[in-house]
Amino acid sequence: APADIESRFDASISSKEMDGWMKKMAAEPNHVGAPHNRANAEDTLARFKAWGWDAKIETFDVLYPTPTRVSLDLVTPRRFKATLTERPIPGDATSSRTRDQLPAYVAFQGDGDVTAPLVYVNYGMPDDYKALERMGVDVKGKIVIARYGQGWRGLKPKLAQDHGAVGCIIYSDPRDDGFSVDDAYPKGAARPAQGVQRGSVADMPLYPGDPLTP
């Protein structure tokens, strides 16, 4: 019976073993091109072969831009310089292993040096710009700051550009994923105060994946 098959399948899964695999894979920064990412691939390959699977590692050259320098400063009415770093978390030894860690950025972000007034655009989605227009707020020539959420991150800088903005900052609002939701990690599941999201803002409708891959 399907239920019996499902029960036998569930019994073959060890949550302790899976937890060990996840901790091993996440023990070091493991983004594309990172040494630990390669180690994870080789470890997974060895595991698959041990299970009797016909497996191999395929190698692809992909376009993966990383910045040489990232900075964010407020210049008026008072000066503030963002640290753009994630502090080690007490109780989590892996959080201090930052040798191969990516900086606080999103892949395919714009390159340049921009200084302009700042405009808050909520989530930076179409309805938010309509609301700003009704209030007489123009983002042309401004830097917009938008919350993560309510839409894919890549839409936020694109919509900002479409409305004439010269820059876009995306941040994680604690109201959405922080202490208002749960206790911060490691006590709870919420994002730590210094946690930074990373990802891509490539134009997915135009490039649904690696821009160099047919």
Please report, for each region that a protein language model flagged, where it lies by residue.
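N-terminal capping segment at the start of a domain
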Residues: A1-P35
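Noncatalytic luminal/extracellular "stalk/propeptide" segments of secretory-pathway proteins
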Residues: K23-D138, D203-L206
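Internal hydrophobic scaffold segments of catalytic domains
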Residues: A55-I57, D61-K81, Q161-A193
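Soluble extramembrane regions of membrane proteins in the secretory/endomembrane system
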Residues: G20, K24, A39, D54, ...
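A conserved hydrophobic secondary-structure block that centers on an alpha-helix together
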Residues: L118-G188
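Surface-exposed loop and adjacent secondary-structure segments within mature catalytic domains
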Residues: L84-I89, S172-P214
